A protein has these predicted regions:
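Donor/substrate-binding cores of folate-linked one-carbon enzymes
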Residues: 1-97
Length: 98
């Protein structure tokens, strides 16, 4: 089996534990959540799925984090279910769910 991880940014942008803060500081207009397989690096494993979350001009780290968490939860339930039911292949960095 493999481990999966959710990350609160659209990897490969903003790895590490401060994704929403880093996105706000950089001034991006879209951030989101990434579901990926775990490898030896920090947030560097093959990407399973991503979901976009718009950044509002009045967002705080807390408000953006909460919206990302909501999207992250939906994504996690959907894709872990698909991985279990349908399986997957990883070719290089590309994850395919049949």
């Amino acid at each position: 089996g493999r481990y999966v991880n959710t990350h609160n940014a659209l990897l490969p942008a903003f790895p590490g534990i401060h994704g929403p803060r880093d996105a706000l500081e950089y001034g991006v207009k879209i951030t989101g959540a990434t579901l990926h397989f775990v490898d030896a690096g920090v947030d560097t494993g093959p990407i399973i799925a991503q979901v976009a979350v718009p950044v509002s001009d009045d967002d705080t780290v807390e408000s953006l984090t909460e919206r990302i968490k909501e999207a992250e939860r939906r994504q996690l339930v959907t894709y872990v279910g698909r991985l279990v039911r349908e399986g997957w292949t990883v070719t290089g960095r590309k994850v395919t769910i049949p």
